[in-house]
Amino acid sequence: MVKFMYNKVLRFKHWYESRFSKILPLWAFLPLVGCFVLNAFVYWITQLLMAGAYHYDFTLPIDRKVPVIPGWISIYILSYAFWAINYIVIARQNRRTCYRLVFADYFSKIVCGVIFIIIPTTNVRPEVIGSSVWEFLLKFIYLMDSPTNLFPSIHCLVSWLCAIGLRGTRVSTWYKVFSYAFAIAVCISTQLTKQHYIVDVFGGIALAEISLLIGEHFVKRKNFT
């Protein structure tokens, strides 16, 4: 049985390296898969655990003045592709950059999980009136994504990691600028779609910065190159 599994692993290794190693090295593949798995686990498990708990609403007066603009749901949805692309771009640079990002991602998601349990949050979504494609997509997101686990915003957290994870890399300056611009656009989209409120945004950005800083110390101690 052990030999059988070993042969399967070797076959996968050869198959992956012959097809995808130029896009993403094998040593970066599993850690990035781990980011996806941990994100899903933290988000959905905490929702189940806290389903019957009291949820806090951190709505501020400024939040009530922000209008709903359904078209911004396009940025909100495109953020998923942005995450995948930038995580690959960052991870393929070298082991140090890869593991700095991965450690920051893992650490921040664990912190999110703890906060989601200690301080479960929610908000009151507006009624979406209209039948345009943007309103349809906004209604769909509202249907699929319950208004819980809001603080800190994982959307803002991961988008900001996608931008700051490029620090110190040889990635072209224009792409770094684009990544910051898109990350900011994602943060704005969370406000204009009422998926999050302002404290969620700043919480996500702050956690991203702290997590990457800790990730930098981690890779220095482990002496990754």
Language model region names:
Residues 37, 75-82, 154-158, 202-206:
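Membrane-embedded alpha-helical segments of multi-pass membrane proteins
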Residues 163-167, 208-216:
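Hydrophobic transmembrane alpha-helices
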Residues 40-41, 109-115, 181-192:
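Aromatic-anchored segments of alpha-helical transmembrane domains
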Residues 46-61, 91-174, 222-224:
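Membrane-interface loops
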Residues 147-151, 185-212:
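Interfacial helix-loop-helix junctions of multi-pass membrane proteins
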Residues 82-86, 157-164, 181-189:
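Hydrophobic, membrane-inserted alpha-helices
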